[in-house]
Amino acid sequence: MKMEVIFKTDLRSSSQVVFHAGSLYNWFSVEIINSGRIVTTAIKTLLSTVKYDIVKSARIYAGQGYTEHQAQEEWNMILHVLFEEETESSASSESIHEKNDNGTNECTSSFETLFEQEPSSEVPKDSKLYMLAQKTVQHIEQYGKAPDFNKVIRAHNFIQTIHGTPLKEEEKEVVRLMVIKLLKKK
């Protein structure tokens, strides 16, 4: 499904990004953590899959004429606000940014660690669910508390929806049980 993004005019004062999926009548919104400066991996992943011309198209669909230059400027502002601003609560810039293989900075939020690492050799039949469970456990170990599981599932659903395979209810339960099992092993 083609996903399009429409942002509120002033992202800095907004607490939501509004996503438009498929039909013009299909709307849903997602809260941005910490006043728009830190977002979950799901939103980052979605943003990285769309280009600034999607913003342009979305504005046109919304009845607001937009030039390509304006769309590019807005897209750059969005990327700056979401990915380059640091929060005062962050421990250090070194812990937030890691160098990837290409030498560019990759921002890592608490939810990004849930999805970016490979599962261990002990992988059950459904590696997708096992990976999600593993990342949840890693989050618990790293931050000393469990993430809001519903947020983790929602984040995973956004990523998976892009590929056409959202989690089913029974899969969510499987992940929850895997997390409990993995925690008991520790």
Swiss-Prot record:
**Post-translation changes:** Phosphorylated on serine residues in the 115 N-terminal amino acids.
Q: Name one GO cellular component term.
A: host cell nucleus
Q: List the disulfide bonds.
A: none
Q: What induces it?
A: Expressed in the early phase of the viral replicative cycle.
Tell me the domain of life: Viruses
Kindly list the places in or outside the cell where this protein is found, as annotated in its UniProt entry.
Host cytoplasm; Host nucleus; Virion
- What are the alphabetically sorted keywords of the record? Early protein, Host cytoplasm, Host nucleus, Host-virus interaction, Phosphoprotein, Virion
The task this protein performs is described as:
Modifies the subcellular distribution of heterogeneous nuclear ribonucleoprotein K (HNRNPK) and may contribute to modulate HNRNPK functions related to processing and export of mRNAs during ASFV infection. Necessary for virus internalization.
Q: How does it assemble?
A: Oligomer. Interacts with host HNRNPK.
> What family classification does the UniProt entry report for this protein?
Belongs to the asfivirus phosphoprotein p30 family.
Question: Could you identify this protein by its name?
Answer: Phosphoprotein p30
Q: What is the lineage of its organism?
A: Viruses, Varidnaviria, Bamfordvirae, Nucleocytoviricota, Pokkesviricetes
